[in-house]
Amino acid sequence: SKDWIVIGWRDESKGREALQKGYEVVMTPHTHLYFDYSYATTPTSKVYAYNPVPDGLTTEQESRILGIQANFWSHIDRWTSRIDFQLYPRILALSERAWSDASVNDYETFRQRVKIHKKWLQFFKTEYNDNEL
């Protein structure tokens, strides 16, 4: 049914294939948006650089991309402090990419803005990867 929404979670090719078949898609490729992966594999800069609109789509196909989503398989990391560390600051990068126009893409400016959030993370005793800020 074309009423279904496809979650393109393996890589972009699955999302692209669904778009070409007429489905609406939420892009969530493991290459950029799996936050249980190490920072060595998926650094915050890579999350921030992610563009959910693959090259070569028609305007109509692009319009069926509903957004992006991060994934975190919690059976791998079950401790809250570890989960928080894996999420922050990557979830902030994902958020900015999700709500911003594609032209908003200066990672260094983003990093400066995110440093403001450090105070909140510390206040709420939330673990985060300070090396990524």
Which stretches of residues belong to each language-model region?
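Flexible, acidic glycine-rich loops studded with aromatic residues
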Residues: S1-L133
